Amino acid sequence: DNLRLRGFPIENNEQVLAAATPTGHCEQAGYGKNCRRQWVASQARVLLMAGDSLGDFVQAEHNTLAAQRQAVEPYVGWFGQRWFLLPNPTYGNWYSAPYGDREEIPFAQKRFFKREALQLQQ
């Protein structure tokens, strides 16, 4: 209803695929998007995708920088053409990837890994 209240042309609730929405014969718990992407692709031609996190486009096996690079490598040419990444500096899988989702490490160490990740890669 929030989308309708903001003027989006939503005719019914089936047009919104929120987290954990059952789609076809695909069962996936949590916030993974693979099932929803597959279902939409079977129903319609997807012209472009926009998101604020890498997981909006592909699913990396682990939340590390190396795994993210590997997951996106086949699609790198799609960014800016078919896929559009919207900046969101406060949220996304990229945020904890530099320290491999290890939330138990000290803040200073997390900051160090983030700064290291900002250095240009050759």
Enumerate the language-model features and the residues they cover.
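C-terminal cap/substrate-recognition subdomain and adjoining C-terminal extension
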Residues: 2-122
